[in-house]
Regions:
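An extended, acidic, His-containing surface patch that forms the Zn2+-binding/catalytic region
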Residues: 88-89, 146-223, 231-244, 252, ...
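Residue-level recognition of well-ordered beta-strand positions that form the cores
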Residues: 105-109, 137, 207, 227-231
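Short small-residue beta-strand/loop micro-motif enriched in glycine and branched aliphatics
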Residues: 15-17, 112-118, 213-214, 329-331
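Short glycine/serine- and small hydrophobic-enriched flexible loop segments
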Residues: 32-39, 133-137, 230, 350-353
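A short core secondary-structure module
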Residues: 65, 121-142
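Histidine/acidic-residue-rich, glycine-tolerant segments that coordinate divalent metal ions
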Residues: 45-126
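Alpha-helix capping and helix-loop boundary segments enriched in small/acidic/polar residues
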Residues: 18-25, 57-58, 93-94, 119-122, ...
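Active-site metal-coordination/substrate-binding segment of hydrolases
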Residues: 1-49, 343
């Protein structure tokens, strides 16, 4: 069975549909929790605001403007977002930190048109090779990023964080096998959870230029480029990282080529204090909803709107993840188990109860 449709189907206690776990299913848990409360108890002891938008996958280009325009109506004591996951089956988790994101593209231009390599090879620059050389120099095979100043401000995990990730049933070999790899890569002096959550990264997301079709075409391309994402951690300044990246690229483009550097996205890493009253209420809610203590984890991905809520709106944000890591978001057979769906509803209802008491 393969389901890529927006229409859902149910099989063996699992709902399959595009958006089942990312993010319609998780959103629905909070709506149904409020509905169940009103049907069984009556008035909800909190003022709830539901903010639903459909542009998250393209960077939410209008969301910040909308929130600022309606700032007074949307101001809240706490924001609850469900766009993360549990650590694994029967392992509920509260995410207290997200990496930031700086996304860049650079485009190298040589001649004013594609050229024949037999006629012009040896006397004109090849943008493909310029881009390849710059990309190769950015990051070593050991996983170390070579851009000077890139690691400025990066701090190791605190002692309590080490204790938390050491609780996790983390198995490098199993994860590598699941991904079809002989082993995990990266900075081997750091354990995998640290590389995944506490260390910044640089990844080339795409490269283009020249001829990539079937067969041969002896072309020297006029232009070539690369798209690069950098996941940042607390202590790194996204604007500063973007400046360092641009300087690194420009210093390495030869005089016989031109370069354009484009900045697409800059958002800082976020850490939510685990002793915040809303986080403490969330721990109790997960304990009641899932029947076990939630793990405290970080997330290697980025949710830029969280940084906006925290830094601009001054609203603490709590990340409730009810899905599973293998729920296939954005892919065929995206899914959400009904068991986790129902536990998510219960957890959301318990949070309303516990947080309303804590907030007075």
């Amino acid at each position: 069975m393969e389901n890529t449709s927006l229409r859902s189907c149910r099989k063996d206690g699992v709902v399959y549909a595009r958006g089942a776990t990312d993010d319609k299913g998780q959103l629905l848990t909070h709506l149904l929790a409020a509905e169940a409360w009103m049907k069984t108890i009556g008035d909800i002891p909190l003022n709830l605001i539901y903010l639903i938008e459909g542009e998250e996958e393209i960077g939410s280009p209008h969301l910040e403007e909308f929130i600022l325009e309606h700032r007074e109506k949307l101001q809240a004591d706490v924001v609850v977002i469900s766009d993360t996951s549990q650590f694994g089956p029967e392992m509920p988790a509260l995410c207290y930190a997200l990496r930031g994101l700086t996304y860049m593209e650079f485009i190298v231009t040589g001649a004013n048109q594609d050229l024949h390599s037999g006629m012009f090879g040896g006397i004109v620059p090849n943008p493909n090779q310029v881009v390849a050389a710059i990309v190769a120099e950015m990051k070593g095979l050991d996983g170390r990023i070579r851009i000077p100043g890139f690691y400025d401000g990066v701090k190791p995990p605190e002692g309590w964080e080490v204790a938390e990730y050491e609780k996790l049933p983390w198995n490098d070999s199993d994860l590598a096998a699941q991904l079809g790899l002989p082993g995990l890569s990266g900075e081997k002096e750091y354990p995998a959870p640290v590389r995944r959550w506490y260390r910044p990264t640089l990844d080339v997301n795409g490269m283009y230029g020249g001829y990539a079709g079937k067969g041969a075409k002896t072309v020297i391309p006029s232009i070539a480029g690369a798209k690069v994402s950098m996941r940042l951690v607390s202590g790194q300044n996204p604007e500063r990282v973007a400046e360092l990246f641009e300087a690194f690229v420009r210093e390495r483009v030869p005089d016989d080529c031109k370069v354009e550097v484009i900045r697409y996205q800059n958002s800082p890493a976020i850490i939510i204090p685990v002793d915040h009253p809303a986080m403490q209420a969330a721990k109790v809610a997960f304990r009641n909803g899932f029947g076990k203590e939630p793990l405290l984890i970080r997330e290697g991905a980025s949710i830029p709107i969280v940084a906006f809520f925290v830094d601009t709106m001054k609203m603490p944000s709590i990340l409730f993840g009810f899905g599973l890591p293998d729920d296939n978001p954005h892919a065929p057979n995206e899914k959400f188990t009904l068991a986790d769906f129902h536990r998510g509803i219960a957890t959301s209802a318990h949070f309303m109860d516990v947080y309303s008491e804590a907030a007075g």
